[in-house]
Amino acid sequence: MPLLHLQREKQTYGYFSPERFVNSQGTRTDEIAMNPAYFAVCPPEEIMQTLCHEMCHLWQHHFGKPGRRGYHNKEWADFMEAIGLMPSSTGAPGGARTGDKMADYAIEGGRFLEAYESLMTDDYRISWMDRFPSREKLMAAIANGTTDEMAGDLSIMGLAGISVEDGEITFEPGERPNKSNREKYTCPLCQRTFGASLA
């Protein structure tokens, strides 16, 4: 049984890491990490696709023959197709089925969409999101319309930098949260700027 982990790894929706964790008895378990920074800016279908993509890596690690680290081989691609996800280097039809950096898309009438549609009802949804999503990802999601179906949820959740009015999502520029452990100060006498630790 893998450990499901939320991790803000830059430029990745998720990843699989075999035998990443160990308990006090020495038992090892695998890790599937999901990036919560994308939860507010990606449709739920895409988030579930990422989880299934990583679960295919988990399956291959235990029951198949994984390629070299990071490589998505034919066996993995065949298993993805079997569960209803088409591997694609571009994330769209026509992309390569194997390679180092791979995306995927749902196959119409496939097992993934069937399971997704039965799971994602009014009673079930991804109900927690990062309140401070990446500005770049947020603006791109608003521009290409991927957040449209989530307008109601985004409005209720009060995400920083997002305004929703009559179903219309807009980006509000504002101050970014201070992610460092330092605060910037300016000397009133000499006007020099310096940093001081917040701790």
Model-derived features with residue positions:
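Metalloprotease/metallohydrolase-associated module, dominated by Zn2+-dependent proteases
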Residues: 1-42, 65-199
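Hydrophobic (often cysteine-bearing) scaffold residues that line and stabilize catalytic clefts
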Residues: 44, 48, 52, 72
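Active-site recognition of the HExxH zinc-binding catalytic motif
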Residues: 49-62
